[in-house]
């Protein structure tokens, strides 16, 4: 009975995902990331459109930044997706 109760508590905590925050890359290195502050629910990656499509900026955002004629911005909502 105790095992069942403990299992239910663990499953409840995992399902509720208490205190979940988004994690986004914030450098060009793929293994470095930061936890986004409250209210910033998107990860973004800005890359040069020409010639090499090199990432110029990554981070967290409340809204997706706009692309320009030189920079393409891609936004996503899952951990480390940028």
From Swiss-Prot:
Coiled-coil zones: none
Disulphide bond pairs: 24-43, 36-60, 64-75, 76-81
Broad class of the protein's primary localization: secreted
Family matches, as InterPro entries: Cytotoxin_Cobra (IPR003572), Snake_3FTx (IPR003571), Snake_toxin-like_sf (IPR045860), Snake_toxin_con_site (IPR018354), Toxin_cobra-type (IPR054131)
Subcellular location: Secreted
Gene Ontology, cellular component aspect: extracellular region
GO molecular function: toxin activity
Stretch forming the signal peptide: 1-21
Entry-linked SUPFAM superfamilies: Snake toxin-like
Tissue spec. comment: Expressed by the venom gland.
Pfam short name (any one): Toxin_cobra-type
Keywords: Cardiotoxin, Disulfide bond, Secreted, Signal, Toxin
Record-stated family: Belongs to the three-finger toxin family. Short-chain subfamily. Orphan group XV sub-subfamily.
Protein name: Cytotoxin 7
Taxonomy of the source species: Eukaryota, Metazoa, Chordata, Craniata, Vertebrata
């Amino acid at each position: 009975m105790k095992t069942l109760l403990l299992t239910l508590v663990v499953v409840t905590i995992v399902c509720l995902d208490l205190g979940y925050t988004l994690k986004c890359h914030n450098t060009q290195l793929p293994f470095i990331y930061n936890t986004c502050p409250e209210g910033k629910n998107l990860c973004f990656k800005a890359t040069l459109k020409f010639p090499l499509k090199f990432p110029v900026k990554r981070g967290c955002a409340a809204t997706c930044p706009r692309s320009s004629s030189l920079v393409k911005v891609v936004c996503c909502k899952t951990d480390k997706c940028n």
